Amino acid sequence: MPDTIIYLMRHGETAENACRPFILQGNSVNGPLSENGRRQAAALATLLESVPFKAFFASPMLRAQQTAQAAIGPRPLTLETMKAFEEVNVGQWERLSWNQIKEQYPRESAEFLANPGTVPYYGGESYVDVQKRTLPVLEDLAWKYVGHTIGIVAHNVVNKSILASILQLPIARARTLHQTNCCVNIIRWTENGPEVEVLNSDLHVRHLPQTL
């Protein structure tokens, strides 16, 4: 049986990504790409020009939608929105820096940082929660598009959760998988299951300002 190739990408930079100190940006922040983010998306589109995508999917968040539309370019494809790939719900910690979180929520933040895989963001989701809503959808797409290549534009925590599962990492270590804005991960889905071929490829945006 032929394999399915999945290009799993992160959206381009937003104003929140560029904030220093770093602030959390979950699923209740729905701003557009920054000027630098649009440049990153254009660089991603150039990289993907020759990739024969059969279908393209994205989170409903505006930053993912804009990145995906840029990546599709002139292809005669309709972008399909998948809520399963929406960014993690970070609850009460939205738009807060970690210093602010530790100061305002000392007990809850200590619990989260001690076990970031299963303890949820305060009032939100955990990495395990994200895996539960993304992995079944990803597998369904892999079997639906056997023998083809598909693209997915998602988010930092979403990508980390998916990749940690495929790499068979303990979920608490998902946070150690870096995902640059507009990075590319390539997953080959075989009859025996998924394999990661490329992880956080970002050479196409290295000449642009880097953010978290």
Where in the sequence are the language-model features?
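Phosphate-coordination/substrate-recognition cap region in phosphate-metabolizing enzymes
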Residues: 3-5, 42-110
